[in-house]
Amino acid sequence: MAFQGTSRTLTQQSSAATSDDLQKILFSPEAIKKMATECDLGRHHWMRADNAISVRPLVPEVTHGRIASFFKSGYDVGELCSKGYMSVPQVLCAVTRTVSTDAEGSLRIYLADLGDKELSPIDGQCVSLHNHDLPALVSFQPTYDCPMETVGNRKRCFAVVIERHGYIGYTGTTASVCSNWQARFSSKNNNYTHIAAGKTLVLPFNRLAEQTKPSAVARLLKSQLNNIESSQYLLTNVKINQNARSESEDLNVESPPAAIGRFSASRSEAFRPQVVNGL
């Protein structure tokens, strides 16, 4: 079907057969596997001393070549209005630390265009995170669609760049970065409003807060901290839910004597995470 010049989506711009061909390119088992292995889509990428700079393209090299060939063939016969563009509305990165908060180090994360030899941040969208800032969510929004072309020996597309700085004495993994995005491909392109890179500091998970009632360990610790003498504990058939870790265990422990007093579950509410230039 010849290109009409009025449609907005790839499906409307090409015949059903060619649309199916593109779907096979994007969602074949091989393409899905390469999106994971080459691009780390939805996977945790470990930042180590021997991998201080990571450049992850948002499209695998083989898939890029096949998509570019698909658009070029349609363009050469007049069915498509261009040789194809890659559009990524947003890239979202979840960053967590894997070392103590005392470790002195930071991460620099930004979105780059592989067509740029210097790999500079797109429109200055760059986020720096100190180790004690983590965990955090980071987002990037490209302001243009990337042409599906080859520059020199490089397949041009967007890429997530992560740089590790500091962490003297830490040769292993100091942070984990999990990136997610949804790439779109079309024969039309556009420009988009410039939005600064988003950085949201996230409150660390409080795994003890999920307890609905005081555990045996909590009551015992409270009695010791209050310097109140308690009689010997005897095992009985009373079941108390123990949830000091993520898994729950049923322990048979006798309730402390009345002299110990009741455990007060009232606490000041946990502070909420500070949001800086949020998503």
Swiss-Prot record:
Transports viral genome to neighboring plant cells directly through plasmosdesmata, without any budding. The movement protein allows efficient cell to cell propagation, by bypassing the host cell wall barrier. Acts by forming a tubular structure at the host plasmodesmata, enlarging it enough to allow free passage of virion capsids. The keyword Transport applies. The lineage of its organism: Viruses, Riboviria, Orthornavirae, Kitrinoviricota, Alsuviricetes. One of its GO terms (biological process) is transport of virus in host, cell to cell. The keyword Chaperone does not apply. Transmembrane segments: none annotated. Its main location: host cell. One of its GO terms (cellular component) is host cell plasmodesma. Belongs to the cucumovirus movement protein family. It is found in: Host cell junction, Host plasmodesma. Pfam families: 3A. Keywords: Host cell junction, Transport, Viral movement protein. This is Movement protein.
